[in-house]
Amino acid sequence: MSLMIKNAHAILSGLPGEAARLAGPDIRIRDGKIAAIGSLTPLPEERQIDARDCVIYPAWVNTHHHLFQSLLKGEPQGLNQSLTAWLSATPYCFRAAFDEHTFRLAVRIGLVELLRSGCASVADHNYLYWPDMPFDTSEIVFSEGEALGMRIVLCRGGATQGRAVEQDLPVALRPETFDGYMADVERLVSRYHDPRPESLRRVVMAPTTVLHSAPGAQLREMAKLARQLGIRLHSHLSETVDYLDAARQKFAMTPVQFCAEHDWLGNDVWFAHLVKLLPEEIALLGRTGTGIAHCPQSNGRLGSGIADLLALEQAGVPVSLGVDGAASNEAADMQSEAHAAWLLQRARKGMLAQPRYAGGTFEGGADAATVEDVVRWGSAGGAQILGLAQSGTLQVGMQADLAIYRLDDPRYFGLHDMAIGPVACGGRAALKALLLNGRPIVEDDAIPGLDLDAMRHDALAAVRTLQQRAAV
């Protein structure tokens, strides 16, 4: 099958430096891969997509999500709480309220939000598991992704020991056994994991948080099994100052040192957040090639802080973007996340500016992140972290994962540089098309077979059901 995208106004590649922008204006796709980029002549019987006045980006790669939280947006008990109190008030409070129907609907809503922003690959850190569960949340995540044509990286969360904020949970939601957790990871790898470059299904070892979800000896065994199986490792780390306090109190070391002691650093490992890091931790992450899923909107919503991507990237840490769960980020789409990352990295550097009489050397932080940087983090960076070696950039020979944005909303009127529109202007740009492995999964801003109005009504009913079950 041959497909040609013609007349693009601008193309961002996901590559660094001068290669970040491509002249185009045409892209030919054959057998799911990019075959040519330049001024091309259509071939006989070649399907064409006219991208006139459109901007093309690599399809976004979201490296951290909790899809089940898509039915927990704006939940009042946790709306103005910081992380630990929010965990008790919202996600832990509602975990037992989910059944197969509400879980499936939440996953579908989250995936649709991402699709409509130009995201085709999603790492879902799913931690809704308990013994004798009457439905298989892993199967639901994969099947919903398949129905929408998306690439799913299932990060198999869970815990084999509890923490203080979980002590009041129903018995059914208490920690799993270590043997049960490990056996299920092996089951999932055997059934779903596909290591091929064009794969649409991957599995990751992902205990919910390394400091609290399992004893150190078990963490080592998890890392060992993951590497034997050829899968990656993921977890939360250093989201707030509480991680520093907990690691010192429990282990007499920093959180990153704890990870190093238990074989949880390396280029096959990435952590969500990494907001509160000491300089020596940044250096250690960089030396080992351990990655970050930067979640600026969730970190802002919970008041956790802003990760120092400048220092992390300079140290050698691979950088990617994640939307986190919608219970702490009501704008859980990749365009919103990219816009926030662009602004907040600049604001973070600007907060460090000092007057010259006090030794300051710069006025502000506008050079901290370019739109091209953010596109690279959200595409090539994500693909690198997830081990998708043939995805993430627009280059000949790469998988054709790309988003064609139609900049026809008033927010884009007056732009001098259309290429930056999908990131710089915020909001959601309509999609001319979204392709994964060269196959359109969104066309003319519509997802085939999806009834958004019915989904809206289902969501309203599901929220009421969850509130009743959680008695809030």
Task: Name the predicted role of every residue range.
Residues 261-268, 310-407:
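His/Asp/Glu-enriched, well-ordered alpha-helical/loop segment
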Residues 132-275, 280:
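Metal-coordinating catalytic core of metallo-dependent amide/deamination hydrolases
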Residues 71-103, 161-178, 241-268, 288-291, ...:
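Active-site gating loops and adjacent loop-to-helix segments of metal-dependent hydrolytic enzymes
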Residues 74-125, 130-151, 183-197, 460-471:
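Alpha-helical scaffold segments that flank or form the walls of functional sites
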Residues 8, 27, 32, 53, ...:
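Divalent metal-coordination and catalytic microenvironments
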Residues 149, 227-232, 264-267, 284-293, ...:
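Glycine-enriched alpha-helix->loop->beta-strand junction motifs that scaffold or abut catalytic
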Residues 1-25, 30, 40, 372-472:
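Active-site microenvironment of metallo-dependent hydrolases
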